[in-house]
Regions:
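Structured loop/turn residues at beta-strand edges in well-structured enzyme cores
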Residues: 2, 16, 39, 189, ...
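Short beta->alpha connector loops
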Residues: 5, 26-28, 197
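Short, small-residue-biased leader/transition segments that mark boundaries at the very start
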Residues: 1-9
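Donor/substrate-binding cores of folate-linked one-carbon enzymes
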Residues: 18-142
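Short amphipathic alpha-helix with an adjacent loop that forms part of the alpha/beta core around
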Residues: 8-17
């Protein structure tokens, strides 16, 4: 036995003699913990299970360009995020939403759904559904943990994919790219706010264009990404025109 199984948590929980346990954004629990209450243990998860099982469901829903996500309450079982579904709420994702906005939408609804789920369990009106019996449109997509390397922008893609990737990581942990200046020096550039400029061009992906004053745009495979908010190492997040007032960029710069 390791981790939470060997600590004092099971002993502390048993002392409460709880009828029901609720888990939100916590690590995987051993059966000795989640099987303790007579009415079970349920979890609040930020996706429409069985889609996006894993640590970063909100990020991946936005990164993949989904137009809808939601929250799910489900009973815990051995495999992570696979227990029987109790209730779900669907939430739209606007094309301009970043992960922070979607997170806040889900947070506003999460407390209410937890309360409704508790009431239903106590009233013995729950009819939970095994996830394998639920209708799913398309293939199941995972939501693995996001690391720094996950956040690097691949410019050799359509601008829609790049745009969704950036907003799916904004404001945290933030998508980034390496900016190579005309003298060959390179710095990491975090990008937070963008727009799609779907205009065919002959520039190589990663080509940077700027007037040095008001705009920066970077080439994808089928258009440009207009950059509106960004951050240099050791500096605060700035609007593009603010950054250009203090940092010299030329059209000879590239990103990759």
């Amino acid at each position: 036995m390791t981790g939470v199984q060997t600590c004092a948590l099971p002993i502390s929980l048993r002392a409460w003699n709880a009828d029901l346990q609720i888990v939100v954004a916590f690590r995987m629990l051993p059966e000795v913990v989640w099987n303790m209450p007579r009415l079970g243990t349920f979890n609040l998860h930020a996706s429409l299970l069985p889609q996006y099982r894993g640590a970063a469901p909100i990020n991946w829903a936005v990164i993949n360009g989904d137009t809808e996500t939601g929250i799910t309450t489900f009973f815990l079982k051995h495999e992570i995020d696979t227990g029987e579904v109790i209730q779900q709420v669907h939430v739209p994702i606007a094309d301009t939403d970043n992960v922070g906005i979607v997170h806040d939408k889900l947070m506003m609804l999460g407390g209410r759904l937890v309360t409704e789920t508790v009431d239903a369990i106590l009233a013995d009106t729950v009819k939970s559904v095994p996830q394998e019996e639920m209708a799913v449109v398309g293939e199941l997509r995972p939501a693995p943990k996001i690391f720094k390397d996950t956040c690097r922008i691949d410019w050799n893609q359509p601008v829609k994919r790049i745009y969704d990737f950036i907003r799916g990581l904004s404001p945290y942990p933030a998508a980034w790219t390496e900016l190579v200046q005309s003298d060959g020096t390179a710095v990491v550039l975090k990008i937070f706010e963008t727009e799609k400029i779907e205009h065919l061009h002959e520039s190589a992906p990663g080509t940077l264009q700027t007037d040095g004053k008001t705009y920066i745009r970077i080439a994808g495979t089928d258009g440009w990404i207009g950059v509106h908010a960004l951050q240099l190492p050791g500096k605060k997040r700035l609007k593009t025109d603010e950054l250009l007032r203090g940092f010299k960029l030329t059209g000879e710069c590239r990103v990759h």
